[in-house]
């Protein structure tokens, strides 16, 4: 397959191809412009992959620009996390990082130009009055009583705003467009508002800050962006984007194109709702492995490659839709099935004693790190007469469909011996505390000599060599596919979204590092937690199960 054939095809790429073929543009220049007021989520990953991916494929450029026009909500912590997320996903921005605040002087000059042209005015209506005057979808707005001020008066009042002569909320600069427009965004939108707050880049130089719709288009033009890609909620804003650029003296006029945002089942993408989950401590932070944030997915064990593949599979369209969580999970499952080394861990342990195994002795059994990749090598795992197995892998009685250990019957221990359950010990409540077995000493990694068939295989960990591990079984944060539609989205949080177990792992897990996944054989894919794991306490997060159990539950 050629490079061109391997590229994804979508309507945005078709537009770019046409622009290049017609000579409208000779290069492609995109940008990713997040506001640094929170952590990026999987929806932002779609935009990152689109903007940076297009720049890569067309040998163009993609800027990382922080839309930092609201100092009250923004923080350098978010700037750093966003930079880290973009790099972790495998992308690199062109040149230096940009900030909308880099252009505050130019933005102010363009605002003055609009005033001089009679296209902007200082309004002293309150924010509540501005909303009231704006009208509704079915009723036109009405003009502010301050709309017809002279150019000279507006210039003087705008300067008064800039120098701190008004209190917050007492004045703003508005575009003079059309209060009867069928598009509410065009009903004299606010261009500048007053905020007496220190800015993380400009300090206290400014007390007036430009609005997104005024800043965004001018920043695109100043940077020479050829294709400004936004999600569909900004479709109506394109009219204002074009109006601003049409009415100022600027040589470049980028075009805005909209695509559908990513909606994912069993989670929320609203920054307000995500913030509420964090501040009300329903989760442990923005990087909680149940969160849809990139940092949360990374901590859970998702790889950058799996997220890029997910974004590639869902594609880019203008049609809003909701993606099944199973689609995201299948991407990480396929990635880790192919690349994760195997290990054995017992999540719900019960002791098994092999009564005829030499007492006090142990041996090493060789296990492949990956059943289909001999190049990944093998490891030596200690085996002894006392092992941990998973409680679910033993039954005193079972039907023929149960292929694990049953009283009086045989099963194979993974890469070790065939054993037979002989008896059990129980506590006062009737819970099994120990399973006693015998083993066939001539079956180490081979079939019994007499030809009898042993169908089941279970995993195990030697008691004498086991590493105590904490296992965090993460699941979907919400119990319904569309929590955002619930009257109270907090009421549908999945109470089983985190279950903590104390188990045992094989000794090789001592070398585990955060972010590197294992397949715990027969259990799922897990990675060492980056927050809670220490040298003395191993904590593993479940990234995803071996199979999509939610799909089965819904059938």
Curated annotation (Swiss-Prot):
Keywords: Aminoacyl-tRNA synthetase, ATP-binding, Cytoplasm, Ligase, Nucleotide-binding, Protein biosynthesis. Residues 317-324 are annotated as: Interaction with tRNA. GO terms for cellular component: cytosol. It catalyses: tRNA(Gln) + L-glutamine + ATP = L-glutaminyl-tRNA(Gln) + AMP + diphosphate. It comes from the Bacteria. One of its GO terms (biological process) is glutamyl-tRNA aminoacylation. It is found in: Cytoplasm. A motif ('KMSKS' region) lies at residues 268-272. Its EC number is 6.1.1.18. The keyword Aminoacyl-tRNA synthetase applies. Its main location: cytoplasm. L-glutamine binds at residues 67, 212. The keyword Cytoplasm applies. GO terms for molecular function: ATP binding; glutamine-tRNA ligase activity. ATP binds at residues 35-37, 41-47, 231, 261-262, 269-271. PROSITE patterns: AA_TRNA_LIGASE_I. InterPro entries: aa-tRNA-synth_I_CS, Gln-tRNA-synth, Gln/Glu-tRNA_Ligase, Gln_tRNA_ligase_bac, Glu/Gln-tRNA-synth, Glu/Gln-tRNA-synth_Ib_cat-dom, Glu/Gln-tRNA-synth_Ib_codon-bd, Glu_tRNA_lig_a-bdl. A motif ('HIGH' region) lies at residues 34-44. Pfam families: tRNA-synt_1c, tRNA-synt_1c_C, tRNA-synt_1c_C2. Belongs to the class-I aminoacyl-tRNA synthetase family. HAMAP family: Gln_tRNA_synth. NCBIfam families: glnS (TIGR00440), PRK14703.1 (NF011291). Monomer. This is Glutamine--tRNA ligase.
